[in-house]
Amino acid sequence: MPHLGHSTCLAQRVYGEAMAHIDVTRNGPYAVHGLPLIRLRLQPDDASGSQDWVERAPIDTSGEADAGGTYWLCRCGQSQNKPFCDGSHRTAGFDGTETAARGTHRARAKVMEGESAEGVGVVVRDVRPLCAHAGFCVADGSDVWHMVRGDDSEVHAAMRDMVDHCPSGALTRAGRPDAAHDDEPRLPLRVAVCDNAQYLVTGGASVASDDGTAYEVRNRVSLCRCGASKNKPFCDGSHADPDVAFTDS
């Protein structure tokens, strides 16, 4: 269990008795409160070119947690006890400075609109800096940005599913541009360790900066765990860069 040297912030979301939130610590790990931890891996479908998440075993956090159940996840990518922090950020001189923008997804999003031949509308919002490059937005030689502009209802249905699988929440969708809320999939409240990739945080858990201010609460976000993202604390796909070559081993 790492010695953080400072108190956790107040940003939190309450689900029953659990305070489900994540604190980004200064140049250190993520302090995770009230969230179960599991493993996920990407399973490609060679026939269709699509992919999906396959849930692996839950991760026991009891040996890493303090008396209150808080556990610490590695953020520098150097831990020898991944996904947990082992203090390597100190010896590695990890610079975990947060560079992500603080505006809301809607305020920052590029908006694309489409309508099927049957008159069913669809709106896709896209915030590129949040993209974790997981690849759910491309399949069968096409992509979300082209599919939304067509009028084929089956293509639109496939596109909606692709958007719903976006792990970073860079892509969202709605039926109308003036809809009060996006149409979000129902996701479990948890943190998922994605094989050789990001932490996928779902279900509306809040994430707070090391200065105590909260980022916008989202249904799904991807947090960097390789230490190389240029959009910290969020994943930008740097783990897949050959110069980073992040692995769980």
Residue map of PLM features:
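Ferredoxin-type iron-sulfur electron-transfer modules and their immediate structural context
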Residues: 21-34, 39, 98-135
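Ferredoxin-like iron-sulfur electron-transfer modules
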Residues: 26, 59-75, 111-133, 143-161, ...
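Intrinsically disordered, low-complexity serine/proline/glycine/threonine-rich regulatory regions
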Residues: 35, 240-249
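Short microdomains enriched in Cys/His and/or Lys/Arg
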Residues: 96-116, 152-168, 185-200, 246-249
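Hydrophobic, ordered structural segments
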Residues: 75, 81-82, 90-99
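Short helix-coil boundary/hinge micro-motifs
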Residues: 10-36, 40-42, 181-193, 202-204
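Iron-sulfur cluster-binding cysteine motifs and their immediate structural context
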Residues: 82-92, 132-150, 163-177, 232-243
